[in-house]
């Protein structure tokens, strides 16, 4: 997977990371917290679309959001997530929903190659039913429902490391290392910053179980 564009000028301060509209009198939005990072909650709606907002709640919490106020109203053991498959490495799938990256695990993929070869590939739009356990998401069921309209997508992610020609993103404690165009090296000052980047959906890193060539130059890392 190649990083097509990095936009460091869009590094997001944590205080500005709430993307849910804050208009007065806004309708209440209800959903389930599926991830959190740096004071930002990722909340999936009943239709599976993930939204980001500032607040405090445990992963798995059922929340009601009105404006910028987040209230915990219960707890869920399962949730629905709809998004685009970005990459698979081992038993981890990286999914982009509404530009937000999620790391979803599936230990069942260790059982054999038949499962991994038939799994939806990068660029596929999927609806995934996940269980929530100790802050992690475990895939229970996955249905491919379409394909992305573009060969690249924009995502928001936190930079955990930079290397010569690579950048490593932190996705709920899992790392995703991708190539930079033309051997570009980013400044170390971006580490810990949340940035908006454009990722190619070409699955060419050579480090997963989807038939990639091991000769491909890729900053392989755990996704």
Walk through the language-model features, giving the residues of each.
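Short, flexible, surface-exposed loop segments at domain boundaries
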Residues: 2-223
